[in-house]
Amino acid sequence: MIPTTLTSAGRTSSRVTSSSVSFVSRGFRGRRRDTEGDLTRVPPGQHVTEDFPVLSAGPTPHTPLDEWTFSIVNGDERETWTWDEFRALPSETVTVDIHCVTRWSKLDTTWEGVSIDTLLEQVEHEAAYVLAFCDGGYTTNLPLEDVSDGKAWVAFAYDGEPLDPEHGGPARLLVPHLYFWKSAKWVRGLMLRDTDEPGFWETYGYHSYGDPWREQRYAGD
């Protein structure tokens, strides 16, 4: 079991090319990377912000908690939790740095959530990848090893408060070592897969993995 409070510098990256995709972005006030005292925490090409910018490709979903569920889908099998069942699971508080592909980084962010390890304990599988699926039809792909062994959570609180819908509430994926688009907002489950399948942004040219320290913003980076 990992400690209840963690600190991570995180690592990741990504890209998009279609003019048909619209963005909603606000709240950015940044400082250049070269003004930071501890450069080891800020990946190349990133600026530190004290705000929490909002970036979405569509409308913000507002799912009532009594209608919310989270599922692990493994072929024809599905393990599902209601909101109350999910909140009854053991949770962890983690403090991590996050890095957006749009070049902002926010340091020392504090979240509370359920470890993906806790959820996967309920399912027998031999999967190598997961595809996160969310309200609004958004998906993103990740290697299983990047969401297990204490690397990822389904987060329901930020800075001690319930997670706002604009930041992915009631629950979002938190995978801080990868670019933040991999921490999918409004997450509703994980599909376990033997092969890697591109998600939403990945089909528009973003990198399949997204390591910010290697600046993997776009396919081919």
Report the location of each language-model feature.
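Alpha-helix boundary/capping motif
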Residues: 2-8
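Structured, non-membrane catalytic/scaffold regions adjacent to prosthetic-group chemistry
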Residues: 22-221
